[in-house]
Design a protein with these regions (language model features):
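Active-site beta3 strand of CheY-like receiver
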Residues: 46-52
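Charged docking surfaces used in two-component/phosphorelay signaling
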Residues: 15-23
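Conserved acidic carboxylate
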Residues: 8
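C-terminal output helix
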Residues: 86, 106-111
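Acidic catalytic/metal-coordinating carboxylates
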Residues: 33-36, 61-64
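Receiver (REC) domain active-site loop signature in two-component systems and cognate sites
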Residues: 55-57
Length: 111
């Protein structure tokens, strides 16, 4: 079973993502900020297949978290979640190590 780390500060979006991923058969760990994601990732010895990261969060944002996770592992898939839809935002995410970018709002099938 694939293990996914979800980091999203908005409760409704995080719940939507988690519910849909669990329904699809994934093992999901969710947190609401970058600092908690680092803590969980470290405590779990990086035992995740994919990380879904919101970009705009208080404290450690998704860009910094993406860079940190990528320094820990080149194996984990990183997907950025954001309401930003400009091409440059997508390019920036890919340049810092993300594998994909999903624009909010999104449907369960996009996950």
């Amino acid at each position: 079973m694939k293990r996914i780390l979800v980091c999203e500060d908005e409760d409704a979006i995080r719940d939507f993502v988690v519910i849909n991923l669990v329904r699809s058969g994934y093992d999901v760990v969710d947190v609401s900020c970058g600092e908690d994601a680092v803590k969980v990732y470290t405590e779990q010895n990086g035992n995740f297949d994919v990380a879904l990261l919101d970009i705009m969060m208080p404290g450690m944002d998704g860009f910094a978290l993406c860079r940190w996770i990528r320094e820990q592992s080149s194996e984990i898939g990183i997907i950025m979640l954001s309401a930003k839809s400009q091409e440059m935002d997508k390019v920036n995410c890919l340049m810092i190590g993300a594998d994909d970018y999903v624009t909010k709002p999104f449907s369960p099938s996009e996950l």
